[in-house]
Amino acid sequence: MRVKTVFFDVGNTLFYASPSRNEIWLEFLATTGFQVQPSILKQALNEADALYEAKLYDYVGQMEKLWALYDSMIFRKLGITDRDGTLVREVNKWWDQPKWYRLYPETRETLQAVKNRGYKLGIISNNNDDLLKQLKSLELSEYFDSITYSQEARANKPEPAIFQLALKRAECSPNDAVHVGDNYEKDILGARRIGILPVLVDRDDRHSDADCLRIRDLRELEACAMRLKSDGFAPREMKD
């Protein structure tokens, strides 16, 4: 196996949200004078998520409009009146702050090391247009030769279509690619289904019996970078 392209998931693989989404919302509501029970907020978010999933593909390039619908629904479910849209605008600004997204300590050095070995790097993410802003704010855009996300692909991992679009953009065949991600069903099974070699990022050691290559830290991928090009992955070295 001669690997040419290494694809990465983003959320909980390269970076993570901190604090949690619910906590970020609760903090915003508190700063604007609203006290909401976490369980009630959770229910409102779940209902708004259903709207988001149903409308996502209709709002390519128009995420501000979709988020306005999404946030308005949350406020309605919480019984909060926002007649002139001020709260919607404020919560969008709140979420645009880079501080909510944090890189794992080894992310940047690993991407640079793998890129230095001559591999093309790509992203395959269940995400929307906002991903491009997140990558830019985290100064990650420069590392990637291609970026593919579900809103524009009109498909979510583990569906084959999003992987196929990523391969097309990278001008790469499945046999020449690796996909690194933290979600077994979406990343591992999705990649394997079309012939891409998957690698599971298992930071919390929850999948010790996984039937795939498994790493606990992106640095383990860096250590195998030379083998990626010359011999492919060596399972005995990558697993326990």
List where the protein language model places each region.
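Asp-based, Mg2+/Mn2+-dependent phosphohydrolase catalytic module
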Residues: 1-6, 16-17, 30, 35, ...
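N-terminal helical cap/lid subdomain that shapes the substrate entry/recognition surface
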Residues: 2-109, 117
